[in-house]
């Protein structure tokens, strides 16, 4: 929990805002990269998790590449100083102009998610007079044991190309003159906490890579995605995810020869270093006796609870009361679903108190909106307090 001294310093900032723990971010990256380098694994940061400029500069210093899901994310990464040859670009709906931009920038690979997309990349590459590196994003039909809203690897998902369609299109893909298949990409989902899922993924990848190789594709890398979850329930108990356990599973079960193994981590890098600081506006009690705390933050700053039903630990960082009550924490947006959590046990909470909504460094600011014409939240960094 934030100390009273830190809470007092935060009082001068206009709420709501994101507070980023720079020391924890550095510790997380040091932990990740020390283990990744041990295995010679390549790491890409999933920039969709958080594109804050200050965080990107820190991440870049650790030699991490970038995983993008839009042309503007590619642009953001390049403008932040990342080497284009460390950038991979996935996404099921790449626009022509986005593909053209990626081709112009000579990024490492465009991860293609349909046969029609491969055809378009080939056409646009021909226009540019280039041969463009692509990776085949394969839908592996794996249940990642996570929230269905962030499951990307089952058979009916919009993501990736079915293995059967790739097999039926081999001759066509190999006939294209302006694309070169250099990688295989897979991503089964996000917030995965059951690590045996990664073993199942490895077994499926091994078969796919062997068959693609036998069909004549000379793969330089295998990108196994990311998806490692974080502890939203008790973030203080696990501020840094268990990268070592995931890498140990991959090392034991993934059999892809001398090919480079790439990962795409987003949530696991930045989730725990960020929290949303919001101020209590009002208290009221409904006709049914439910105690509401209305804060100046809302689903426009942090949409995950409203969108996914996601849980975030909430604390009152200014109240010193001994009495604790159960509250429902709601935001200012004109939506009934704008609820951060229900039955939250907090010390007696009054107007002006500061609450922190923890583990909000990933998919918080990057999913923020200006619905109801709300201002976008600011950012405060721990080393500047």
What residue ranges belong to the model's regions?
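Short acidic, glycine/serine/threonine-rich loops at helix termini
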Residues: 56, 79, 99-104, 121-124, ...
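Short, glycine-/Ser/Thr-/acidic-enriched flexible segments
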Residues: 24, 50, 73, 94, ...
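Hydrophobic residues within beta-strands of alpha/beta enzymes
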Residues: 66-67, 87, 110, 184, ...
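Charged (often Lys/Glu-rich) extended helix/loop segments that serve as interaction or gating elements
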Residues: 249, 258-385
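Short beta-strand segments
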Residues: 46, 133-139, 185-187, 223-225, ...
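A charged N-terminal "starter" segment
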Residues: 1-132, 174-180, 207-214, 345-348, ...
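Active-site loop/helix belt of alpha/beta enzymes
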Residues: 141-282, 346
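Hydrophobic "anchor" residues on beta-strands that sit immediately upstream
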Residues: 44, 133, 221, 260, ...
């Amino acid at each position: 929990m934030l100390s009273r001294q830190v809470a007092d310093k935060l009082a001068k900032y206009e709420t709501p805002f994101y507070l980023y723990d720079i020391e924890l971010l550095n510790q997380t990256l040091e932990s990740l990269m020390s283990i990744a380098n041990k295995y010679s694994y390549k790491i890409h940061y999933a920039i969709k998790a958080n594109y804050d400029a200050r965080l990107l500069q820190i991440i870049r210093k650790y030699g991490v590449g970038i995983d993008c899901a839009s042309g503007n994310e590619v642009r953001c990464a390049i403008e932040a100083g990342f080497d284009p040859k460390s950038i991979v670009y996935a996404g099921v709906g790449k626009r022509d102009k986005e593909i053209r931009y990626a081709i112009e920038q000579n990024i490492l690979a465009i991860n293609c998610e349909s046969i029609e997309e491969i055809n378009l990349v080939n056409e646009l590459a021909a226009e540019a007079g280039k041969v463009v590196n692509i990776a085949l994003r394969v839908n592996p039909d794996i249940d990642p044991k996570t929230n269905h809203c962030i499951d990307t690897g089952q058979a009916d998902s919009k993501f990736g190309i079915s293995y059967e369609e790739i097999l039926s299109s081999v001759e066509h893909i190999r006939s294209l003159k302006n694309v070169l298949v250099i990688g295989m990409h897979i991503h089964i989902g996000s917030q995965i906490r059951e690590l045996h899922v990664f073993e199942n993924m490895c077994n499926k990848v091994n078969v796919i890579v062997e068959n693609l190789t036998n069909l004549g594709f000379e793969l330089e890398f295998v990108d196994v995605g990311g998806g490692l979850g974080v502890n939203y329930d008790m973030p203080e108990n696990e501020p840094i995810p268990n990268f070592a356990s995931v890498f140990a599973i991959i090392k034991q079960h993934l059999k892809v020869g001398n090919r480079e193994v790439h990962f795409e981590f987003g949530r696991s890098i930045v989730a725990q270093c960020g929290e949303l600081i919001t101020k209590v506006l009002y208290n009221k009690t409904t006709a049914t006796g439910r105690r509401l705390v209305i804060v100046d933050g809302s689903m426009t700053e942090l949409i995950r609870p409203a969108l996914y039903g996601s849980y975030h630990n909430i604390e009152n960082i200014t109240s010193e009361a001994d009495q604790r009550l159960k509250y429902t924490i709601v935001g200012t947006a004109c939506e009934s679903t704008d609820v951060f959590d229900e039955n939250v046990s907090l010390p007696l909470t009054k107007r002006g108190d500061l609450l922190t909504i923890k583990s909000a460094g990933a998919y918080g600011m990057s999913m923020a909106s200006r619905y109801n014409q709300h201002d976008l939240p600011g950012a405060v960094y721990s080393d500047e307090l």
